């Protein structure tokens, strides 16, 4: 990802490209929290500290220089809560907030057909999606593949299809029940996510909102 980011910045003509290691901060946080975490196995908590450190670092630069942080979340991730609150959800604006992951790939491929040379590195498009919080991590270890996930999300969110209707349309029942549950449970994260471009008829935060607590179900 570091090399892909550097190449993308070069292709976009970004001169002030910076790499700021988070390892010292991560080590300091682990040391600070060690007494409180004593006797507990390492888990997602320690992984998410990395994302939150990146978010804190970006917001510090924003604060110091008056820049706005662009959030990288897309609608698929935002829908199911596949994001770290106060980590990769930080930012003042989210360009891809209302764009499903499969459409993001389509946009990348389209963008690379415009102009004299491709802008987005092929590695960004070709490599398996990953939060990169642990070695060999892939999104499809936690979620259905995006070509399976997105049609379920579109049916549930854009077309208000019920669980029985989604299953009747040929989607796997376990996937449907799991995905719709994730969507409902992630409302509290979406309420705290940055504003962004509205692309669909059911943009989160404006056109589609659920209660934060899920006792209504």
Which role does the model predict for each range below?
Residues 1-217:
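ATP/NTP-dependent adenylation/nucleotidyl-transfer catalytic domains that generate, transfer
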């Amino acid at each position: 990802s570091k090399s892909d980011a550097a190449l993308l910045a070069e292709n976009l003509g970004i001169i002030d490209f910076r790499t700021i290691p988070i390892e010292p901060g991560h080590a300091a946080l682990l040391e600070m929290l060690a007494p409180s975490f004593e006797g507990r196995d390492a888990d997602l908590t320690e992984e998410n500290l990395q994302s939150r450190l990146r978010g804190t670092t970006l917001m510090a630069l924003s604060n110091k220089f008056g820049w706005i942080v662009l959030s990288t979340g897309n609608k698929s991730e935002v829908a199911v809560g596949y994001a770290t609150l106060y980590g990769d959800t930080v930012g003042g604006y989210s360009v891809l907030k209302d764009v499903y992951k499969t459409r993001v790939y389509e946009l990348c491929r389209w963008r690379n057909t415009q102009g004299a040379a491709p802008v987005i590195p092929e590695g960004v498009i070709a490599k398996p999606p990953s939060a990169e919080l642990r070695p060999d991590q892939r999104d499809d270890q936690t979620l259905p593949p995006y070509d399976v996930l997105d049609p379920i999300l579109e049916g549930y969110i854009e077309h208000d299809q019920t669980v029985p209707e989604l299953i009747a349309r040929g989607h796997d029942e376990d996937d449907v029940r799991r995905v719709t549950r994730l969507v409902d449970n992630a409302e509290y994260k979406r309420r705290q996510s940055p504003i962004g471009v509205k692309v669909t008829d059911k943009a989160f935060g404006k056109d589609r909102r659920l209660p934060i607590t899920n006792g209504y179900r």
